[in-house]
């Protein structure tokens, strides 16, 4: 700063030789700085207005022509701009369709914060309230310690002025003695803040996990609902940041409030001892603080929206990374690294642009904030400290003839000045933390919006209420699905039968509808009795796999009725096996009994010898010979495609359900092993519902369900010619 001042002085001296006074130069310099600040603040607003008007103007255009400046830009900039437009379009679409409230300091924020507070602190007497009580006690103790330390420092200066070595040494010992509890309390405040943050996060994580796995929400959120794009990011990063912000804000708001209240009382008492007016100083400080706070609130950027958008773009970047990891083999086969890297760069550039916007907004806001806090408030503090000395009733030294008494009064005034200065520094620090907390509260509003919004979506999807953005523009007038407030209503019913004599599955006028509300089959009515082995055929996209999702309860039923047997103890009604089976984290035993646990296996009295027999049925006994049942491996990479499919069949033989939903589950298995598997399944009394393109499996079924891809279907008994054809091909 001194170097800059010297540089300005030299320029001013040169200007004086040309007829400009130093005062005029300083005035011009300050005016230029204020003008630059005004331009910097107003330009983003003007750009925002122009962008909004241009979007409205171009909304009706359909030709999609590019401006000359866009044509002349580089390909990378053009693609980045297109990605930005797509992102803005998606956000506008979500606002228009879902009536979303923008994150900010509003009633919705208070409502969401209250909801999350009830989750973090579920009752009056719990672990979290205990932490809060101890934390609050430490904060109050720290305030009293600050006041006591300020008084000790004032006494130290007093005895230095008096040259009283004995009293100085005594007060200095007290000062060193108070340092031990003061440092302990400071450390405890940080420790309790961390513990409080972890406790809040644990409560939120447990509650959100409970919702996430309720009624298969983990599937519904990503496949049936379109409001949450990256649930994993919200469940991990957003909850963590929200919990940290709440715990930190409690300290940032509570401690300054205690400081201001107690320090204000201490200053008023000191002014009273100096026989000065105790109202003028506090009134002046309150007025200055209120005025500066109002100005900062007016010019404060919308940090809540900015932070929420930053978290959204960061979550999308993580999503791109995870997608590349998941599909690494396919990308490598296609040689699509250039496309993936380009998408990754675009996602990262969007995040960088948003972070740069936040940095730019913070630059000028923090500059103005520091001007008020460091200089305006410091000047006000100087006036507050000087008023009791200048306006006190006994301020003149010349009226007192006794030199000793005069020196005593000088030392007392010095003590007051030192104590008041230290207290004012603490008070200014408290006010600065309160003002800085406003930005943190606005940022907290963004994370509150995301976390509370996630839980609201979880609760709605658990009740069967879904919202897909692509549904809003089409399929709302199909006459089959009823919509309410832009959301499809599942009016169909699932009826569970407890009659042991009625173990059939029946669909009565049930439409096959995709998550986007596309009608695949308008009405499907059929009855599948035990022993009716059903073969399902038809072209791609005709509704074969969709039927399995409806039977399994993954997709909602928008009309009609689905009658299924109620699962009894240890005997599931249906067991679905996809073409690409899922291999869980665990041992070989865990792969066979999934989704059972070892405790479930022991309760069913199933031994390892029975598991070996099951592996032998699917020709996987060599795996048990190579590895024990307790060895934990990455089975997804160890097993081949055919071995994974046979492992899924082993799960079927372990659980022995009434009905097996087989979706191309043996496409990578040899024909002889496949035939053996189907024979064993029928011998166990499992009714087979099979989707396959292999005619060799026809002979294991009694009925056929044919879809034509146009919404029509036919359910009939398989004739002898079709059975003979299957036997001939096998």
From Swiss-Prot:
InterPro entries in the cross-refs: AAA+_ATPase (IPR003593), ABC1_TM_dom (IPR011527), ABC1_TM_sf (IPR036640), ABC_transporter-like_ATP-bd (IPR003439), ABC_transporter-like_CS (IPR017871), ABC_transporter_sub-D (IPR050835), P-loop_NTPase (IPR027417)
Cellular location(s): Peroxisome membrane
UniProt-listed Pfam families: ABC_membrane_2, ABC_tran
Binding site for ATP: 538-545
GO molecular function, one term: ATPase-coupled transmembrane transporter activity
Coiled-coil residue windows: none
GO BP: any one term: very long-chain fatty acid catabolic process
Ranges for domain ABC transporter: 505-727
Transmembrane domains' residue ranges: 24-44, 137-157, 169-189, 276-296
Coarse class of the protein's main subcellular location: membrane
Phenotype when the gene is knocked out: RNAi-mediated knockdown survives to adulthood, but suffer from neurodegeneration including age-dependent retinal disorganization with retinal holes and pigment cell loss. RNAi-mediated knockdown in the neurons results in a similar phenotype. Effects are probably due to elevated levels of very long chain fatty acids (VLCFAs). In contrast, glial-specific RNAi-mediated knockdown results in no defect.
Protein's membrane topology: Multi-pass membrane protein
GO CC entries: peroxisomal membrane
Key words, A-Z: ATP-binding, Membrane, Nucleotide-binding, Peroxisome, Translocase, Transmembrane, Transmembrane helix, Transport
This enzyme's EC code(s): 7.6.2.4
UniProt cross-references to SMART domains, sorted A to Z: AAA
Chemical reaction(s) catalysed: an acyl-CoA(out) + ATP + H2O = an acyl-CoA(in) + ADP + phosphate + H(+)
Domain ABC transmembrane type-1 positions: 136-373
Function: Plays a role in the transport of free very-long-chain fatty acids (VLCFAs) as well as their CoA-esters across the peroxisomal membrane by acting as an ATP-specific binding subunit releasing ADP after ATP hydrolysis. Thus, plays a role in regulation of VLCFAs and energy metabolism namely, in the degradation and biosynthesis of fatty acids by beta-oxidation, mitochondrial function and microsomal fatty acid elongation.
Similarity section: Belongs to the ABC transporter superfamily. ABCD family. Peroxisomal fatty acyl CoA transporter (TC 3.A.1.203) subfamily.
Name of the featured protein: ATP-binding cassette sub-family D member 1
Species whose genome carries this gene: Drosophila melanogaster
Phylogenetic placement of the source organism: Eukaryota, Metazoa, Ecdysozoa, Arthropoda, Hexapoda
């Amino acid at each position: 700063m001194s170097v800059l001042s010297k540089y300005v002085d030299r320029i001013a001296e040169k200007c004086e030789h040309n007829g400009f006074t130093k005062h005029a130069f300083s005035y011009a310099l300050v005016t230029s700085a204020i003008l630059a600040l005004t331009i910097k603040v107003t330009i983003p607003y003007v750009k925002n207005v122009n962008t909004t008007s241009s979007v409205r103007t171009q909304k009706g255009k359909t030709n999609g022509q590019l401006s000359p400046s866009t044509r002349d830009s580089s390909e990378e900039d053009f693609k980045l701009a297109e990605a930005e437009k797509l992102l803005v379009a998606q956000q506008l679409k979500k606002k228009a369709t879902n009536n979303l409230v923008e994150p900010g300091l509003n009633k919705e924020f208070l409502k969401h914060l209250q909801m999350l507070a009830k989750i973090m602190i579920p009752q009056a007497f719990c672990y979290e309230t205990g932490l809060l009580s101890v934390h609050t006690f430490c904060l109050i103790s720290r305030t009293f310690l600050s006041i006591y330390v300020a008084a000790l420092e004032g006494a130290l200066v007093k005895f230095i002025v008096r040259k009283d070595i004995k009293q100085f040494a005594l007060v200095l010992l007290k000062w060193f003695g108070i340092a031990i509890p003061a440092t302990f309390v400071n450390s405890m405040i940080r420790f309790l803040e961390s513990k409080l943050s972890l406790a809040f996060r644990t409560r939120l994580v447990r509650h959100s996990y409970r919702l996430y796995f309720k009624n298969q929400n983990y599937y519904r959120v990503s496949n049936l609902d379109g409001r949450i794009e990256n649930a994993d990011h919200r469940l991990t990063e957003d909850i963590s940041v929200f919990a940290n912000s709440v715990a930190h804000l409690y300290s940032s708001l509570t401690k300054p409030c205690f400081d201001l209240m107690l320090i204000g009382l201490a200053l008023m008492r000191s002014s009273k001892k100096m026989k000065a007016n105790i109202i003028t100083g506090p009134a002046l400080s309150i007025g200055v603080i209120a005025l500066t706070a109002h100005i900062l609130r007016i010019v404060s950027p919308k940090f809540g929206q900015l932070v929420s958008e930053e978290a959204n773009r960061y979550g999308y970047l993580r999503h791109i990374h995870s997608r590349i990891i998941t599909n690494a083999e396919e990308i490598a086969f296609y040689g699509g690294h250039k496309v993936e890297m380009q998408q990754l760069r675009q996602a990262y550039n969007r995040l960088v642009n948003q972070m740069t916007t936040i940095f730019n907004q913070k630059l000028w806001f923090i500059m103005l904030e520091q001007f008020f806090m460091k200089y305006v408030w410091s000047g006000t503090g100087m006036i507050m400290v000087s008023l009791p000395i200048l306006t006190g009733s006994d301020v003149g030294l010349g009226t007192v003839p006794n030199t000793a008494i005069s020196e005593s009064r000088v030392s007392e005034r010095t003590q007051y000045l030192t104590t008041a200065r230290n207290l004012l520094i603490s008070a200014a620090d408290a006010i600065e933390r309160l003002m800085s907390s406003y930005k943190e509260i606005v940022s907290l509003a963004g994370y509150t919006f995301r976390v509370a919004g996630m839980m609201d979506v979880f609760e709605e999807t658990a009740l069967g209420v879904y919202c897909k953005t692509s549904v809003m523009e089409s399929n709302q007038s199909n006459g089959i699905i009823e919509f309410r407030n832009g959301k499809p209503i599942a009016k169909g019913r699932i009826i569970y039968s407890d009659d042991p004599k009625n173990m059939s599955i029946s669909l009565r006028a049930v439409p096959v509808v995709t998550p986007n509300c596309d009608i695949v089959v308008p009405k499907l009515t059929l009855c599948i009795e035990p022993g009716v082995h059903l073969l399902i055929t038809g072209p791609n996209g005709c509704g074969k796999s969709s039927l399995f999702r409806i039977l399994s309860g993954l997709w909602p039923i928008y009309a009609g009725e689905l009658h299924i047997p109620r699962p009894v103890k240890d005997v599931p009604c249906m067991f679905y096996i996809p073409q690409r089976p899922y291999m869980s984290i665990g041992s070989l035993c865990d792969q066979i009994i999934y989704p059972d646990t070892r405790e479930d296996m022991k309760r069913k009295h199933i031994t390892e010898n029975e598991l070996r027999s099951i592996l032998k049925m699917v020709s996987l006994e060599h795996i048990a010979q190579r590895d024990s049942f307790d060895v934990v491996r990455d089975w997804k990479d160890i097993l081949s495609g055919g071995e994974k499919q046979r492992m899924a069949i082993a799960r079927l033989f372990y659980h022995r359900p009434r009905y097996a939903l087989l979706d191309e589950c043996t496409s990578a298995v040899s024909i002889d092993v496949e035939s053996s598997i189907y024979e064993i399944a029928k011998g166990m009394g499992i009714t087979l519902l099979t989707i396959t393109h292999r005619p060799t499996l026809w002979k294991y079924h009694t009925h056929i369900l044919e879809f034509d891809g146009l919404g029509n279907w036919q359910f009939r008994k398989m004739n002898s010619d079709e059975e003979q054809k299957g036997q001939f091909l096998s």
